[in-house]
Structures are given as C-alpha cells and as structure tokens.
Amino acid sequence: MAVPQNRVTRSRRNMRRSHDALVAGNPNECSNCGELKRPHHVCPSCGHYADREVVAQANEVDLDEDAA
C-alpha cells in the first residue's frame, strides 16, 4: 500500500503551500456604462469592448403584453 516514507514537517508542508494563495480580482470600470468588468473582457452589462458594441443586448419582453 502507498504510505508516506517519512513525516512531512510543518515547515516543509507550509513551504509547499506557499504558492496556493488566491489572488484578488482587479475589476476595471467600463468606459461606456461605468459598471465594473474584468480587464480585457466584454462588459457583461452593456456588451461593449474597447468603445465598440461587441455583443448586442437583448430587449426585455413583458410576457403579459405578448400573451394577449
């Protein structure tokens, strides 16, 4: 069976884990709508990237009016 050959000390364990920390995100402000977005990504709220509309936003449909 696979078992550890030697005990891993607290120091060696912590040195191995020293690179596992999470990095906080760095959101930027969208130049079109002002919402926070990820750097180098299309704005999820307005669909703009680099001052052009890349993703057209769908219009919200009121289901009560269309049902009639």
Curated annotation (Swiss-Prot):
GO biological process, alphabetically ordered: translation
MF terms in GO: structural constituent of ribosome
Organism: Paracoccus denitrificans (strain Pd 1222)
The keyword Ribosomal protein appears for this protein: yes
Record has Ribonucleoprotein as a keyword: yes
Keywords, alphabetical: Ribonucleoprotein, Ribosomal protein
Region of interest (Disordered), residue spans: 1-24
InterPro entries on file: Ribosomal_bL32, Ribosomal_bL32_bact, Ribosomal_zn-bd
UniProt family annotation: Belongs to the bacterial ribosomal protein bL32 family.
One GO location term (cellular component): large ribosomal subunit
Protein name: Large ribosomal subunit protein bL32
Pfam families named in the record: Ribosomal_L32p
